[in-house]
Amino acid sequence: MINAPSAAAVCALCFFAGIQQEKPEDKPQEKPSCPMHEQQKISPEEQHQEGVVQRGDRVMGFSHERTAHHFLLYSDGGAIEVEANDAQDTASRDAIRSHLGHIVTLFAAGDFSAPMLIHAQNPPGTEEMKRLRETIRYKLENTERGARIRITTKNVEAVHAVHKFLRFQIADHLTGDPTEITKAP
C-alpha cells in the first residue's frame, strides 16, 4: 500500500523547491513592477485617492478618467458639474445625466449615502444638509457634455453646510476648483 503525501507536505515541498530555484532578482521586494511592492510605496493619501476613483467609477457608473468634475461655491449655494472630456462620448454624457438625476432625488430626500460610498466617509456638511433639506433646492440642468446640479438656499446655515460639502468634494476629487465663493453663471 502506497501512502499518498498530505496536501500540507506537497505545499511545503513546492514552497521549498521554489525558494531554492528563486534568484535574488526574482524576489518581489526587488522588482519595481511587482504590484505588492508598488502598493507598499503608495502613501495613505494616494491609496485614498485610488479608492475614491475606484469606488466613484462603480457608484457613479462612469469613468473619472473620461470625465471632469467641478464643484463651485456661490453666495446662494453652489453647483456640481460633471462633463465628458470628449464631446463624442455620448455614453459618458448619458451616464452623467442619469447619475446626477439620481443624486438630485437622493439629496432632496436628505439621503447622502452616494457620496459616503465614494469617499468612505460622510462628507462634511451632509448632516446639516439633511436636517435643513426643506430649505435647500436641487435643480438638474443638462449641459452639452453632461449635467449640472444647481444647489440653492436662502438659509444661511444651509449655505455654510453646502459650502463645507463642496469644499470637501474639491479637495477629495482634486479638481483644483476655487474654494472661495464665485459669481453664479
Residue ranges and their predicted role:
Residues 1-9:
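Bacterial N-terminal signal peptides that target proteins for export
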Residues 11-185:
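Intrinsically disordered, low-complexity terminal tails/loops enriched in metal-binding residues
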